[in-house]
Amino acid sequence: MCLLLVSFGVYGQVSEADTVGQSAYPFISYEADTLINPAQLQPFFDKLLKLENGDSSQLSILHIGDSHMQADFLSRQVRTRFQQRFGNAGRGLVFPLRVAGTNEPTDYRSASNVNWTTGKIVGQNRDPEPGISGISVRTSQSGGYIDITTLNHDDLDYAFDQVTLIHAKDSLQFDCRITDSELKFGYLMSAADTENGTYQTWVPFTKPTNFVRIQAEQTSESQNAATFSG
């Protein structure tokens, strides 16, 4: 589930502390360590400078990688330092990895009351089709839910006031109820006014929260599953 899509900034300056002598790592070819067409990065750094000067806009950064990204090792350090310096726009893209039976970062938790079928971009099982996180989950049990709880850390508050759910949407998909521990925030009708495919549904909340529950709900005999990608 997308919990307030992450936005953060960084602005770097070269100093003596950033420089490592070539003698320390003689096997590195520093001449080959060159950015091609660095001028294309200037708009990016201009936005970072605006954030540093107090601008309230958001800058989204997509960090692509392998299982080390999934476990949030490097990406957590980068995200934390960016947000501590330039402002915290939220935890960003999360997926219920624990529910899917794999490793999960330590700054949020996922749980469910049912078992989910998992489709991963690695391996031979790609049913359901993997989504933006490289993985998707599906349940055929009405009433099955996924809980997401964000955890504050390093003086960063990861409460959120909106959710963007990436999901399959057609006449065969369950409807979904989106709630916190007390309030009903939204209701997703999977077959309403849409062609078949993958969709993003945005749900605003009435107040910040660290918890959301997405619950599948069968409302017609034709519905047989719920499929989530992010």
Across the structure, where does each feature detected by a protein language model lie?
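N-terminal secretory targeting modules
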Residues: 1, 9-64, 68-230
